[in-house]
Amino acid sequence: MTETNFDFLAQGDPAIAAIIGRELQRQQEHLELIASENFASPAVMAAQGSVLTNKYAEGLPSKRYYGGCEFVDQAEELAIERAKELFGAAHANVQPHSGAQANFAVFLTLLQPGDTFLGMDLSHGGHLTHGSPVNVSGKWFNAGHYGVNRETERLDYDAIRELALQHRPKLIICGYSAYPRTIDFAKFREIADEVGAYLLADMAHIAGLVAAGLHPSPIPHCDVVTTTTHKTLRGPRGGLILTRDAELGKKLDKSVFPGTQGGPLEHVIAAKAVAFGEALRPEFKTYSAQVIANAQALARQLQARGLKIVSDGTDNHLLLVDLRSIGMTGKVADLLVSDVNITANKNTVPFDPESPFVTSGIRLGTAAMTTRGFKEAEFAIVADIIADRLLNPEDSSMEDSCRRRVLELCQRFPLYPHLSPATPVAV
């Protein structure tokens, strides 16, 4: 949002303007370590806040149910072509409102109610839409689950194969929300072929790394690939479906509209196009490589301070801290770091004895603060701040020191310096 938009908003709705101003200040003065968050560019935000929000456009480009779509058609076509180029896909649907919507459209295309599919257990790093009993994927379908090896805390492909042979699923899902290691999509393809299953990769967390060529691509191996467009892709919040099979792509299109959605959000689709264009530039690969280097630096320094990292490290943008060794829950750790302006999230760890509302771990990600310019040296400092806070939870002077160091880092690497509330905002 530009200053001009702030001015309009301050005049039209001072209450909302004040709330947004406070949120801006929160983002500027906090270390954002939630692995699923990032900071979109001003260009992405400008597209999303444009006049395209006014246009209804049910259908696909050149096949709309409304008139006046010639320019939103151009924007959506550009988003489609950029997505295909970015990921090497034959077909792209840019209309899903979210990753969850994208996944549901795939289920509608490939499965019937009661069919069996196989996905990772949520407590091991899977996602709600991969068969959790509280999600439609777990209510309408027969969901089987695999996990990680207890000793290595990594995927055990032999065990996954055995489960696939046992369940004979119609669909296998790979791609996760809290798995810090490289995924062998080719191995999953072998398993899927052996049992005659479709293979879906949900690469929501690693899409930016895949786009940059820093994680193996699922496109050559999977029947369908879904992703969000924020996270490591650094775009607007939304979803995307990709496939190398153009004919399957036509069926997926029908499952998005009219199957699961009505009108697409053309202002968001334009913002997706901007983000895809940014990701096609050479500097995006440099950024993505720094994201991984920063995550590894963060993990190393946390380990040096005596904290346990699930799977003993990371290959991507996220890591899980297992807090059982220091006798702390994820819920408590989340609150402790929040007190010193660090935003993270409690998270289950493999074979976690605690409930999802308590957990034994916290999940940390480096994508957002890398966008702000952090490198390995800064993330080593971040690791020390986190360790100081978690290892000294009752020390008020240490709490003050941690908060001060966080604010110093934030001031060194400003976020959206061109943005400021139109009117003073009390915090």
Swiss-Prot record:
MF term (GO), any: glycine hydroxymethyltransferase activity
Record PTM N6-(pyridoxal phosphate)lysine, positions in chain: K231
Pathway: One-carbon metabolism; tetrahydrofolate interconversion; Amino-acid biosynthesis; glycine biosynthesis; glycine from L-serine: step 1/1
Gene Ontology cellular-component annotations: cytosol
Annotated site (Plays an important role in substrate specificity): H230
Enzyme Commission number(s) of this protein: 2.1.2.1
Cell compartments where the protein resides: Cytoplasm
Cofactor dependence: pyridoxal 5'-phosphate
Catalytically driven reaction(s): (6R)-5,10-methylene-5,6,7,8-tetrahydrofolate + glycine + H2O = (6S)-5,6,7,8-tetrahydrofolate + L-serine
Biological processes per GO annotation: glycine biosynthetic process from serine; tetrahydrofolate interconversion
Similarity comment: family membership: Belongs to the SHMT family.
Record HAMAP family: SHMT (MF_00051)
Subunit structure: Homodimer.
Identification of the protein by name: Serine hydroxymethyltransferase
Species lineage: Bacteria, Bacillati, Cyanobacteriota, Cyanophyceae, Synechococcales
